[in-house]
Amino acid sequence: MKTSGVFLLLSLALFCFFSGVFGQGAQVDCAEFKDPKVYCTRESNPHCGSDGQTYGNKCAFCKAVMKSGGKINLKHRGKC
C-alpha cells in the first residue's frame, strides 16, 4: 500500500511539473486585443514569440499574432 501511495504522489508531482512547463508557452488568450481600436500600453511584461522576437507585453504579442495570421506562438514568458 505504501509503495502504491508513493508512486501515485510521484506521478501526480511529475504531471503537475511537466504540465506547467509545457503548458506555459502553449496558448495566450488574445480575445481582449482583437479590436483594432485597442492600443497597447507600454507596460513591461515580456513575451517571447516563436519567431525569436521579444514583445514588450501581452498586447504587443497578441497584435503580432493577429498580424501574422496566427503563425506566431508563445515560446515562453520573458525575454527571448
Swiss-Prot record:
Location in or out of the cell: Secreted
Highest taxon in the source lineage: Eukaryota
The keyword Manganese is annotated on this UniProt entry: no
Sorted UniProt keywords: Disulfide bond, Protease inhibitor, Pyrrolidone carboxylic acid, Secreted, Serine protease inhibitor, Signal
Family matches, as Pfam families: Kazal_1
Annotated Kazal-like domain residues: 24-80
Tissue-specific expression: Seminal plasma.
UniProt name for this protein: Serine protease inhibitor Kazal-type 6
Organism field: Bos taurus (Bovine)
Site (Reactive bond): R42, E43
SUPFAM superfamilies in UniProt: Kazal-type serine protease inhibitors
Gene3D superfamilies, sorted: 3.30.60.30
PROSITE patterns: KAZAL_1, KAZAL_2
Primary role: Serine protease inhibitor selective for kallikreins. Efficiently inhibits KLK4, KLK5, KLK6, KLK7, KLK12, KLK13 and KLK14. Doesn't inhibit KLK8. Inhibits acrosin, trypsin, and chymotrypsin.
Signal peptide stretch: 1-23
Modified residues (Pyrrolidone carboxylic acid): Q24
MF (Gene Ontology): serine-type endopeptidase inhibitor activity
More details: The sequence of BUSI-IIA is shown.
SMART domains: KAZAL
Stretches of the chain forming a coiled coil according to its record: none
GO cellular component: extracellular region
S-S bridge residues: C30-C62, C40-C59, C48-C80
Lineage, uppermost ranks: Eukaryota, Metazoa, Chordata, Craniata, Vertebrata
